[in-house]
UniProtKB/Swiss-Prot annotation:
Entry-linked InterPro entries: ClpP, ClpP/crotonase-like_dom_sf, ClpP/TepA, ClpP_His_AS, ClpP_Ser_AS
Keywords attached to this entry: Cytoplasm, Hydrolase, Protease, Serine protease
Residues annotated as the enzyme's active site: 107, 132
UniProt-recorded name of the protein: ATP-dependent Clp protease proteolytic subunit
Protein encoded by which gene: clpP
Quaternary context: Fourteen ClpP subunits assemble into 2 heptameric rings which stack back to back to give a disk-like structure with a central cavity, resembling the structure of eukaryotic proteasomes.
EC number: 3.4.21.92
Biological-process GO terms, alphabetical: protein quality control for misfolded or incompletely synthesized proteins
Domain of life the protein comes from: Bacteria
Enzymatic reactions: Hydrolysis of proteins to small peptides in the presence of ATP and magnesium. alpha-casein is the usual test substrate. In the absence of ATP, only oligopeptides shorter than five residues are hydrolyzed (such as succinyl-Leu-Tyr-|-NHMec, and Leu-Tyr-Leu-|-Tyr-Trp, in which cleavage of the -Tyr-|-Leu- and -Tyr-|-Trp bonds also occurs)
Length: 209
């Protein structure tokens, strides 16, 4: 069984040391970036990841409800309900969430990318975006399989509605696009309404001082 905590603890995470008025303080790199209101969604999306991302979003809202949150995405997708918990929290909190795909935003990762604030959804030039309909496998009694199939259909319709809301496409166009695995370049994703801009470098106004 997949253990996200074990995976995290056995992955080398760089530490950074910061000088403060009280001396030195060490952070793991992701905690240090969280101080700058940067959240990473990296790897498969599952319950272990989603509750950490949701907690970070709520923490940053409590810290400053008026300051933007930046979400960097490199994910092949994962569990639909886990992804929707992150998506719903992004929509729920007061701070605007900008999204940037680095590498790939596939399946549920693409939903989170599209769910960023309009005008603040970005892609690096060599990233890939993939959309498709949800899938699942079930076993057991025929009646239970039918129940799960009906629930999958409801989730599919809900995801279609989310894409319609954030891309500006019609329901029919979304259904056609998601019928099979549909890979898009950043240029294609921008034309489809999935992202707003393709960025190759930081603007001068974004340079660290």
């Amino acid at each position: 069984m997949f253990d996200p905590v074990d995976t995290y603890m056995n992955t080398l995470v760089p530490m950074v040391v910061e000088q403060t008025s009280r001396g030195e303080r060490a952070y793991d790199i992701f905690s240090r970036l969280l101080k700058e209101r940067i959240i990473f969604i990296n790897g498969p999306i599952h319950d272990g990841m989603s509750h950490l991302i949701v907690a970070q979003l709520l923490h940053l809202e409590a810290e400053n409800p008026n300051k933007e949150i930046s979400i960097y995405i490199n994910s092949p997708g994962g569990v639909v309900t886990s992804g929707l918990s992150i998506y719903d929290t992004m929509q729920y909190i007061k701070p605007k969430c900008s999204t940037l795909v680095i590498g790939q935003a596939a399946s549920m990762g693409s939903v989170l990318l599209a769910g960023g604030e309009k005008g603040m959804r970005f892609s690096l030039p060599n990233s890939r975006i993939m959309v498709h309909q949800p899938s699942g496998g079930y076993q057991g009694q025929a009646s239970d399989i039918m129940i799960h199939a009906a629930e999958t259909q409801k989730l599919k319709d809900r995801l279609y509605d989310i894409y319609v809301k954030h891309t500006g496409q019609t329901k029919k166009a979304v259904e056609k696009a998601l019928d099979r695995d549909n890979f898009m370049s950043p240029e294609e994703a921008k034309e489809w309404g999935h992202i707003d801009e393709i960025v190759e470098s930081r603007s001068k106004g974004d340079d660290a001082e």
